[in-house]
């Protein structure tokens, strides 16, 4: 834990003069704003000090509403008809769906000046270069307790076809598409395959694994996490969460298996039904300021798509392969595809079977 606090302190001190200059300029140009911004976000997925700073700088309150899966995000927006929220954190796959549903508002580069700091490779991933501002990116991999397992994890097969000592000690992400995609990798198939036989084989592998799984949920990132306490020995996990857990236990390891994995990028987007568009744009631009993007990345242990922010981060952070995967990992990995409705139904059916 001390390492995390020291890193946060160093990053904050490095950026304090930059932030003060940015704050003074913003205050001078500030128009009248709404009093509350509703931010639809994953839990524990933003540096709370940045939220407080935005509130103080703008004289507003940021109210976070949390969701725990992409499916729940969609359900929440369907139930509310997209009304009642201003800014949303959306994965690359969710962003495409939200744009098709007409729930999110196009964002121009003029409206978010700090887009100029983004690495062009991430801007090219924006849906039609119109929706969403890159927030954080990373990988899906495996975290495990090296002291308990006493053998290296190198393949997805070790997670999906577990040995007897892992019975009940496995945690799996609560995302049907990622679970099936990596099951395909474990079988030596392409993670993007929509071939019915490939999907059926992956589903059978997941069914066989299910009795050995202790829980289907996103891994908690605190001292009570099952990986920290030893209740779980191995978990499918997002890379930054594994890096955070390393600070609670030195024997937690993170690996992207040799078959490769999914890359992901989360984005900040504006709900079309917002009544606070000016404030929403200001919040997104604030989070995209290089100093703020760097602070957020350091706090959460995820890679930032903000090229100017990377220049402000410590060398040890940028050199950590769990945060910034090496070229060999990137070459065997890719973003999750959109799947045909028929395939999605197959995937969701098997996932419902094993998780209920």
State what each model feature region is.
Residues 138, 199-209, 248-272, 318:
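Periplasmic-binding protein-like
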Residues 271-331:
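Mature extracytoplasmic/periplasmic domains
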Residues 94-97, 228-229, 233-251:
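A ligand-binding cleft/hinge motif common to bilobed small-molecule-binding domains
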Residues 85-89, 216, 233-238, 253-254:
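Paired acidic/hydrophobic, glycine-rich loop segments that form the ligand-binding mouth/hinge
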Residues 26-97:
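Early extracytoplasmic/lumenal segment of secretory-pathway proteins
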Residues 141-148, 185-188, 265-276, 295:
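A bilobed periplasmic-binding-protein/Venus flytrap-type ligand-binding module shared by bacterial periplasmic
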Residues 328-356:
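Conserved C-terminal helix/tail region of periplasmic/extracytoplasmic solute-binding proteins
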Residues 84, 92-214, 218-231:
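Extracytoplasmic ligand-binding site segments that recognize negatively charged/polar headgroups
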């Amino acid at each position: 834990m001390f390492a995390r606090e020291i890193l946060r302190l160093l990053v904050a001190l490095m950026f304090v003069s930059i932030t003060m200059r940015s704050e003074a300029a913003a205050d001078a140009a500030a128009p009248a704003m709404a009093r509350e911004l509703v931010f639809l976000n994953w839990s524990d997925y933003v540096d709370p000090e940045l939220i407080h700073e935005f509130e103080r700088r703008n004289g507003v309150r940021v109210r976070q509403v949390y969701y725990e899966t992409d499916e729940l995000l969609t359900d929440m927006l369907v139930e509310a008809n997209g009304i009642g929220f201003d800014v949303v954190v959306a994965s690359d796959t969710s962003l495409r769906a939200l744009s098709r549903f007409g729930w999110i508002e196009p964002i121009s580069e003029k409206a978010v000046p700090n887009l100029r700091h983004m690495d062009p490779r991430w801007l090219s991933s924006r849906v039609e270069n119109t929706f969403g501002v890159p927030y954080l990116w990373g990988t899906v991999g495996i975290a495990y307790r090296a002291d308990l397992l006493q053998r290296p994890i190198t393949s997805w097969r070790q997670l999906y076809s577990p040995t007897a000592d892992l019975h009940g000690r496995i945690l799996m992400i609560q995302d049907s598409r990622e679970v099936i995609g990596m099951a395909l990798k474990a079988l030596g198939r392409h993670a993007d395959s929509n071939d019915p036989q490939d999907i059926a084989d992956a589903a059978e592998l997941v069914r066989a694994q299910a009795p050995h799984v202790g829980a289907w949920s996103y891994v908690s990132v605190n001292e009570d996490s099952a990986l920290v306490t030893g209740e779980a020995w191995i978990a499918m996990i997002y890379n930054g969460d594994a890096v955070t857990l390393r600070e609670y236990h030195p024997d937690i390891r993170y690996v992207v298996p040799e078959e490769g994995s999914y890359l992901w990028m989360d984005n900040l987007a504006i709900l079309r039904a917002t009544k606070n568009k000016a404030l929403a744009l200001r919040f997104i631009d604030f989070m995209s300021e290089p100093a703020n993007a760097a602070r957020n990345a350091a706090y959460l242990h995820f890679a930032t798509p903000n090229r100017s922010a990377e220049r402000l981060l410590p060398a040890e952070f940028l050199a950590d392969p769990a945060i910034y995967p090496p070229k060999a990992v990137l070459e065997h990995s890719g973003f999750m595809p959109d799947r045909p409705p028929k395939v999605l139904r197959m995937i969701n059916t098997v996932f419902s079977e094993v998780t209920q």
